[in-house]
Every structure is written in structure tokens, then in C-alpha cells.
Amino acid sequence: MAQGSIKTAIVTGAASGIGLATAKSLQAAGYRVFGTSRKATVDAGGGTRMLVCDVTDEASIADMFETVFGETGRVDLLVNNAGFGISGPAEETSVAQAQAMFDVNLFGVLRTTQAVLPLMRAQKGGRIVNISSVQGFIPAPYMALYGASKHAVEGYSESLDHEVRGQGIRVVLVEPAFTRTAFDQNLVQPDKPLDIYAADRAGRSKFWNEVMKTADAPEVVAKVVVKAATAEAPKRRYAAGPKARQVSLLRRFVPARAFDKAIRKEMQLPPMS
């Protein structure tokens, strides 16, 4: 492939997990890939150029885009993957904790997207792939605030896609289910635990241990990201992996009460009265 025809991709949160797998898969697909991490010492390997970027800091984002654009003269693909979760009852999570997570999961997406849109518009095209979650369209007991942040990403992405499609830019969602990454190990615990939920915490730990045994590898999600990035006529959303596809179908076609019962059974919650 000639140098001038090589497309440039940026993957935020590329130090590990889905971001790292995506960076490697995009490079294998022919992209010149820049990954971002909050730490300068991270090496994604495989030829991915790692840059320092804090998605909560507009100056850091501007510096990152200036570096990429200065070296390549274009940005064809932005994959917004950086994010983290809070696990626990919604009542136990403080507003400050929730704000910190939304600052990354939602407003980080907003900041990087607003920075890249003028560049994509000037080159008359581009694609933005936002990593959401099945928890962006289903109830997420004991991860309510994380689910809320992904619901917000879904609404933002769908609306933005309509706004910029006429400019040659598409905004696409990729929705993984449980994935074998360090995400579950890095879940932030609520900062104001309540005694009434003490027994639930032990149950949640058991639940996580069980679901992670059958969780998808990050490469499964990365493969779907490449598909979303390269499709000539992309869908607005892509379920990533068999479990995500199953949940998506159930959400669309199963009656609400039956779906609620299925959620409670999956999460090992008491039956509905």
C-alpha cells in the first residue's frame, strides 16, 4: 500500500484490553495506528505509536491531535474506547464518583469527537467508532451509573451520526458484552457503602467470577471494530460477539416483563413478585 493511501486511526485507551486488541487489529487491516494512554511508558507493540492523552483534559487532547495530524496530515478513524466502570448499588455511589466516571465515559467522547470533527470535515470524510456496551441498552443492576454513561453515549452517537452524515462522516456504535479484560478487576467500588447491601456484595463477586469464565476475548470485539470502521455503508450499531448479539435480539423482540425476568435470573436476583 502506498504511503499516501494509508489511513490513520486513533484508539483511545489502547494500553490494554479492547483498546490494545483494536489497535493491533486495525494495524493488521492496513491502518497507521496511534494509541493513547494516560501514561507515556506504555508500549502497545506491533507498530502502534503510543501517545499520552488524558480524555478529561482538552489541552492534552489538542496536543495529541496536533502530533497525529502533524505526522500524517489526516485522521480517518477515531475509536473512542477509554473508559472505566463503577460496580455496586446506585444508592452507594456518590455524585462526585459518578461525575468522575461520566467525565471519562461520556465527556471524554465529547471532547475527542469535537476535536476531530473539523479535521475530518476538512478532508471530506471520516469515521468515529464509539465503544459502548450492551449495558447501554439494557438495565444494569449494580452497575447503574456505568450503564447510564453508556446509555448517554448511545444517545449522543445516534444523534451525532444524523448531524454529520451529510459531511461524509459516520458515527458508529460497537456494543460488547462481558469481555476478558482487566475491566472487572479495575471496577471502582462505591464510596459510601450501606449495610443493607452487604449481602449483595458477596453475591456480585460470585456473579462476576462466573460470567468472566465465558466472556469473549477482546480480539472478538476488535474484529467487530474493524468491520465497523471499514464497512462502505456501516450500520449504526454493531453487537460485538455472540452474547451481545443474543442480548440485543432479546431486548428487541422479547416482551418487557419477560425480559425483566431474564435479567433478574441472569443477575441472580430474587424473582419478581
List each language-model region with its residue ranges:
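Conserved glycine-rich cofactor-binding loop
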Residues: 15-16
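The beta1-alpha1 cofactor-binding region of Rossmann-like NAD(H)/NADP(H)-dependent oxidoreductases
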Residues: 53-63, 95
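Substrate-binding pocket helix/loop in short-chain dehydrogenase/reductase
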Residues: 89-90, 97-99
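Active-site loop immediately N-terminal to the catalytic Tyr-X3-Lys motif
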Residues: 91, 138-144
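Active-site helix of classical SDR
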Residues: 113, 149
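Residue(s) in the substrate-gating loop at a strand-loop-helix junction
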Residues: 133
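C-terminal beta-strand-loop-alpha-helix "lid" module of Rossmann-like NAD(P)-dependent dehydrogenases
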Residues: 165-212
